Structures are given as C-alpha cells and as structure tokens.
C-alpha cells in the first residue's frame, strides 16, 4: 500500500539535536513542512555522505520553511557520539532520531527485519502531517539531497496552486502545467 496522501501515524521517539536529547512526535511535524530521511545505521559509510549533503542543503530546507529529520535504527545516544566524532555528521544542525524499537521504520515501510536496519527512504510531509512524496531504494545507493529539496519545493508549489502540476526536472520559478483537454497530445 502506498503511503502517499496518508496521515503520519502517532509516534514518540528520541533524538539528538543541538547538543541535547529531545523527544520527537507526530505533532512535532505539524505546522511546517518536514523531511524524514531514513538511513541504515550510524557509523557506516554512505550515511555520513548523505548527512553532510543534507547539512550542505539545510539552508535551502530552512528557506522553504522545512525541518529535516535523520532516522536510523540506532539509539539517540549513538547519534550523540556519531555527531561528536564524524566530521560529516558533525555538520548536522537537524535532529538525529534514534529508532531502536523500529517504530518509525515499520510505520514508514523501510524496516529490514532480518538485518534490524532501515532502507534508504525519504518522505516529504506537509504541515498537516500528510505524506506527499516517498522515495525508497537499496542501501548501496546514496541519495542526492538537492533532489529532495526540489521535490519539497514542487510539493509546496502544487499545494499552493491546486490544478497545476510540476513537470520533469521542474525547479522553483520555472513554468508549470495546468492539465486540460487542450494539452492532450501536445506535450
């Protein structure tokens, strides 16, 4: 079953953020756009490259009024040490969520039971807590977080402009499409 246009289910997890431990719930996501980025585990190889990419794009997320949450199946205690020891992860200014009970990874369909890890999944969630984009793929392939920013902005645009769609490779400020009978066969 697709998670697109479904409400984020209730949850409560702990995270490491800005030098302290915090609690994150589904209510934490409401009132702003949110991006959940699931990763297999702390202290791995591709995960720090993605966190660094997210950190390098964090200004774009903030300009768009969105918060980023990194989620692994480790504890928030592990994330504290990871943040303190990894130069790439140390750049993160967003919450690093620990999901050792697999509450979130199961709810978002990215849990790998036989490994106790998460698949690489990315979810853009609107201010009402509704999932608008889903990307899940193999753990051997790291994501381009710049593409996640593009998808966030496209989701925001279409939310603000009902009846319009963002074509392939659409970037903020570019022309969109208004589907109609007149467009059929002309694109």
UniProtKB/Swiss-Prot annotation:
GO terms for cellular component: cytosol; extracellular region. One of its GO terms (biological process) is cellular response to stress. The active site is at 47 (cysteine sulfenic acid (-soh) intermediate). CDD domains: PRX_Typ2cys. SUPFAM superfamilies: Thioredoxin-like (SSF52833). Gene3D superfamilies: Glutaredoxin (3.40.30.10). Keywords: Antioxidant, Cytoplasm, Disulfide bond, Oxidoreductase, Peroxidase, Redox-active center, Secreted. Pfam families: 1-cysPrx_C, AhpC-TSA. Its EC number is 1.11.1.26. The active site is a conserved redox-active cysteine residue, the peroxidatic cysteine (C(P)), which makes the nucleophilic attack on the peroxide substrate. The peroxide oxidizes the C(P)-SH to cysteine sulfenic acid (C(P)-SOH), which then reacts with another cysteine residue, the resolving cysteine (C(R)), to form a disulfide bridge. The disulfide is subsequently reduced by an appropriate electron donor to complete the catalytic cycle. In this typical 2-Cys peroxiredoxin, C(R) is provided by the other dimeric subunit to form an intersubunit disulfide. Thiol-specific peroxidase that catalyzes the reduction of hydrogen peroxide and organic hydroperoxides to water and alcohols, respectively. Plays a role in cell protection against oxidative stress by detoxifying peroxides. This is Alkyl hydroperoxide reductase C. It comes from Pseudomonas aeruginosa (strain UCBPP-PA14).
